[in-house]
Amino acid sequence: MGKIIGIDLGTTNSCVAILENGNVKVIENAEGARTTPSIIAYTNDGETLVGQPAKRQAVTNPQNTLYAVKRLIGRRFEENVVQKDIQMVPYSIVKADNGDAWVEVKGQKMAPPQISAEVLKKMKKTAEDYLGEPVTEAVITVPAYFNDSQRQATKDAGRIAGLDVKRIINEPTAAALAYGLDKAKGDHTVIVYDLGGGTFDVSVIEIAEVDGEHQFEVLATNGDTFLGGEDFDIRLIDYLVDEFKKESGINLKGDPLAMQRLKEAAEKAKIELSSTQQTDVNLPYVTADASGPKHLNVKVSRAKLESLVEDLVQRTIEPCRTALKDAGLDVSDIHEVILVGGQTRMPLVQKTVAEFFGKEARKDVNPDEAVAVGAAIQGAVLAGDVKDVLLLDVTPLTLGIETLGGVMTGLIEKNTTIPTKKSQVFSTADDNQGAVTIHVLQGERKQAAQNKSLGKFDLADIPPAPRGVPQIEVTFDIDANGILHVSAKDKATGKQQSIVIKASSGLSEDEIQQMVRDAEANAEEDRKFEELAAARNQGDALVHATRKMITEAGDKATAEDKATIEKALGELEVAVKGDDKAEIEAKMNALSQASAPLAQKMYAEQAQQGEGAAQGEQAKSADDVVDAEFEEVKDNK
């Protein structure tokens, strides 16, 4: 069995890790970094860039550079958070035929799982380059508060990337695994506070020793899947835009290039203000008007940044309170607080968390890598390489069905340990009702319409009977990934209907298969592009070497030699500018043949010169010989 890698598929950055010889190794990518920006760019020459190369060109290509796409995964276009996102990003978010939020690049609509799959492919390749063998299996993390649609969409992204997703695991749970595996024996309860680039989660986790086994039991989880570092950046960007408008009268909001530069500068300033009290945001030539170019230069203090984002930090406290209440615990019952996610490096976040929980958070957990490390440990557990770990996770939201009067009736309550199965008997609402529609919902509201619709299916051919007589047993079954399977059975006839919830939105099996094929075709395209680039480089090198040879040959090259070589050179230079690899190789061969006679002539001449020089050296050394007398000395020891 091959290795099962652990992937933290983040909103802002992603990370991949593997368990090797009992230790978890976070794997560096091709650029030498341990985390990879979750950014994908589509260039004008048809190349797809992922990670740092995509981030570097974002300023000049904002409309075709996609970031924070995880915030759209498994979401409907009409959702408020999506409408809010549309106002914040320079790329185009569009409504798919099924009502989902998709993105559009260069006139082509793409599903968020397709975009996330590009990041996963980069993670997969990073692991393969390190291990020297193909990788096909992975554990991928998601925010604990992701609903069923978002989990399913993440699994789909893995399939599109060519990965068999062995388990979807919650990010705070993964971080607790990374923290708790090597800790002292005995039971203790930890809070994992995970504030990442786009999502916020908090989980109450009990780490216990049961018969020599590490047991990680999630007692409760809560969160906000649209709150993270990106929102902190936006507050600072808005402030910088306002300051610039006050000074110059120009609103930068309508200029995508300027806004992309501002985004980068704001992120950099935010990071700097975690370790300094003040920083300058300096963007020369940010825009221009009739009077000439304009420069942005704004001083930002840590206090100013904190005042801009204070309410965002406070928004994280209510989920903490709810999670504790759901777990039936007080703040005093918490032994350790673990901070995960890059945004937790902000001093205000650390101070607020410490004040609420009455204790400083631990500093020995790497907030950027802990989640991937935990995913790798879970991968090793599934592969059988780690034996003494048991993970008991929960479903984050209540699952139920719509019943008479538009009411949501819960079958599986939030924070129920998974996997789990629950059945309940329902009946018909009308006399002689021949079919019932099972409308599956997820959420905490009593009104069905206020919750997330996961899907509908019909149970037909119910024998005629007065209302309330037929007995229809609805069974909810949640697997270890937190993904729901629902069935309904007429107890009188034994007739059964079931679905794996694919959400009323989501990707169909055909769409996923098509995207898998597209991804494979893209991999082939990428390979061809690399080969073409290599051929162009070889062609350029040969042109350079041949011109150098002609220069060095001087008078030794006849006019005929030069004419033949120049013709072949010109043809190769034209071929190198084209896109035909075979043509480049053919013209390289032609140039090699055309220049061969001159090369041989020069080689022969060099050889002759070499021989002449060698003979001269020999004669010289013969003249320099000095006769000497030697006396043998015997060494008596």
Curated annotation (Swiss-Prot):
CDD domains: ASKHA_NBD_HSP70_DnaK-like (cd10234)
This protein's record includes keyword DNA damage: no
Highest taxon listed in the record's lineage: Bacteria
Keywords: ATP-binding, Chaperone, Nucleotide-binding, Phosphoprotein, Stress response
Modification Phosphothreonine, positions: 199
InterPro entries per the UniProt record, alphabetical: ATPase_NBD (IPR043129), Chaperone_DnaK (IPR012725), Heat_shock_70_CS (IPR018181), HSP70_C_sf (IPR029048), HSP70_peptide-bd_sf (IPR029047), Hsp_70_fam (IPR013126)
Identification of the protein by name: Chaperone protein DnaK
